[in-house]
Amino acid sequence: MKLRYIINENKLVFTSCNMRDKIITGKKIIFSQSVAKDQTKNLSSFLSERFYSVNQSHNHSIIIGSSLSHQENDIEHDTILDTSGVLVTTDTNGIVNGARVAITDGLGGGNGDQEEDDEIYRVSHSSCENFLNCDQNIDTTLSLITQPKASDKKQTAPKTLQHTEASMAAFIYQNHPGKGYIGEFANIGDGLIIILDKRFKIKHMVSACHIYRGFGTWTPPSLQALATTANKDALLVRQTLKLAEGDIIISMTDGVWGELKTSLIAQTNDRRDIGVDKEYFKTLFDELTDAPYPSSFDIARIITQRAMSRSLERRKTLIKLINEIEQQHFHEKSVKTINEVLEYFIKTGHVETAQTLKAILFEDGLSDGITYFENIEIPLEMVMHDLKSRTVGDCSTINVTRIPYHLDELIRGFINYPEKHQILAPLFKARVKSEADLEEAFHRLSLEMVQPEIECPISETHFERAFKKETLDKTQAVLTHYFRISTGLDSKKNYQERLNDLSAYLSKESSLEKNDIKLLLSMLDSEIKPKTGVFQTLFGENQNKLYKAFHKKIELQLLDSEIENKNELK
């Protein structure tokens, strides 16, 4: 197996040539320009300055960044408080059979307080990494990672430590023999998980959750709150779902999905469950309709671009509105309520401004989830504070995972682990039902793209083919020959006839090289080697003798072939 060593966060990450075992986002600090100065930024420059691509493989990608942009002042060192990661799991043969995926959102911060941000990031990152590193089911994992460690109890830390919290959206999926892929999903807070089929139709949504705190305030629960509550169901959205090969799982912090068109799924006096509008969401992927096998990065990029585009447009609308209100100096005119502001704008001919303000406040015109009741005296000062807070933005992270095709993973293992060819042979025999199965799998693998670096700014992303064409062509040829031979070895024929059929096949296939034949014989060994016991000489057959004669014949054929090749070169 071709291997590379990649240094990330001072840790050695062991990788194969086409995928990485584990990725987790590292600490990111960006320059956060004030809203007033940031209005002229176009989407491309906004993303290039603030977002990063973290790539595990064609099937697992993360885009992490921030739309934070404060009202008046630049913040030189603004820490991204989200974390996301993927840990791929394998069976005893090294074949990918599942993954653990998590995305965490550090709650609070973002005000330029470096000490506070560092502590929030620490909790966010450690929560994510602990989830990935645990080897238990999701319920046990959540229980374990929310238990305070002895080191934390002894630690003398700033007062912020006591109140530092993080929300989490996470899942584990695994391929169960005979049952297919099963996924365990958990959402604690305002992350959101959406499961799509391979045609981008929404199958399931693991909703975000907000808890009512009183005084009209709704906030997300956290892992820390989950650890201390007796009624965990009140804070946790938990689902176990059957998944299909090719399904796409998108997990996002609210800095991404909150910028899209949202939908209230359910509400009680104590809790809201929130998701995205399904009809709107499926339109995001119109450009991928004809793409045969888009990468997880392509999917993450499209959603991120749409979300940040809406964020910038919303921000520009708000800034323009705020400026128009402030230019009127209403405090000098004794205008103190929103109704008075609306009346003033209409009387003075600023009808468009009045309509914009009314739509934002009373009609959820920006789809940001905050609406007011009409015909109530609403203080202008309170609304101005609200409007300015809506321009701030948020840390924004998206993780896209595709459920792998098991045959693709068998082929990947066949390429990456040559020493396991013989062990994998019966798995191919059980899985492959036709040559078309192999053709489809190799076509998908030919489309796989991987980012050479684990992490890079989104403006610098570039991708390479995960496999060389000659590698796939050679492997497909060998496995196609194996399929034809193994299905053609009729067990109803006697031992001699089966060996004769195999010998005839190998001799007539001129494309087979010496190493190919040796590999095929190794893979077929369990099917053609002599049976032990009394049946070895059944009907007068001495299978050991026939087996040795067969191998001698093959060796002579290979020797003759080598001599012919040498003569042709003279």
Swiss-Prot record:
<dbReference type="GO" id="GO:0043087">
    <property type="term" value="P:regulation of GTPase activity"/>
</dbReference>
<protein>
    <recommendedName>
        <fullName>Phosphocholine hydrolase Lem3</fullName>
        <ecNumber>3.1.3.-</ecNumber>
    </recommendedName>
</protein>
<keyword id="KW-0964">Secreted</keyword>
<comment type="function">
    <text>Virulence effector that plays a role in hijacking the host vesicular trafficking by recruiting the small guanosine triphosphatase (GTPase) Rab1 to the cytosolic face of the Legionella-containing vacuole (LCVs). Acts as a phosphocholine hydrolase by mediating the hydrolysis of phosphocholine to Ser residues of host RAB1 (RAB1A, RAB1B or RAB1C). Dephosphocholination of target proteins restores accessibility to GTPase effector LepB. Can act on both GDP-bound and GTP-bound Rab proteins.</text>
</comment>
<dbReference type="InterPro" id="IPR036457">
    <property type="entry name" value="PPM-type-like_dom_sf"/>
</dbReference>
<keyword id="KW-0843">Virulence</keyword>
<keyword id="KW-0378">Hydrolase</keyword>
<dbReference type="GO" id="GO:0005576">
    <property type="term" value="C:extracellular region"/>
</dbReference>
<dbReference type="GO" id="GO:0030430">
    <property type="term" value="C:host cell cytoplasm"/>
</dbReference>
<dbReference type="GO" id="GO:0044606">
    <property type="term" value="F:phosphocholine hydrolase activity"/>
</dbReference>
<keyword id="KW-1035">Host cytoplasm</keyword>
